[in-house]
Amino acid sequence: LGDVYKRQENHRYLSDLLSYVAVGARSVENQEHRLVSSGLDIPVGMKNPTSGDLSIMLNSIKAAQGDHTFLYRGWEVESKGNELAHAILRGSVSKHGNNHANYHYEDLRKLHDAYCTGNYKNPAVIVDTNHSNSGKKYLEQVRIANEVLHSMRHSDDIKNMVKGFMVESYIEDGSQKVEDGVYGKSITCLLYTSPSP
């Protein structure tokens, strides 16, 4: 079971169930998310921020991979670092509200090069096929995954770095406004039985 890691204090209630957590685009700059991630014994994906600045995401990964001593819930805590902290590319939004994808070959190559120069452990990326990468057009998710698979066939570096995809799906196809209240329909998702890439 995976979870988007919004509130660190909730982790202790779910820790026996979770095998993966993602730190969202709006939380990736938060120092407490980085420190707590360094003490987890499961993979933690760090999304790029909505600005698209990869250096922020990479700094978050570096912090999560390092060991730390910090205060958490009134206790002094020591973490040994999480070598499984990695990138999640989710696209970005410009100051004018335009979506910009970052799953293309050139984007993956740029991330690989940054990993190589930064001395990271276990360079890895999950590609988020929704959010700004799809422009919130959920039916684009399969095409995006196929494009990344194509990039992986043309570069061993990219093939070794890409570990999977984040695909949003739910019981009913399509999306709805929060106030619509249709059971089984998400506010962002693809039908869970839709064909895979």
Question: Predicted regions: what is each one?
Answer:
Residues 44, 122-123:
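Residue-level detector of short coil/turn "hinge" positions at structural boundaries
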Residues 123-131, 195:
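Short acidic catalytic loops
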Residues 179-188:
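Acidic, Ser/Thr-rich peripheral helices and adjacent loops at domain boundaries
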Residues 3-114, 131-132, 136-147, 151, ...:
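Active-site-facing alpha/beta catalytic cores
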Residues 119:
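Acidic (Asp/Glu)-rich catalytic clusters
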Residues 1-8, 192-197:
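Conserved small/polar residues in nucleotide/adenosyl-binding loops
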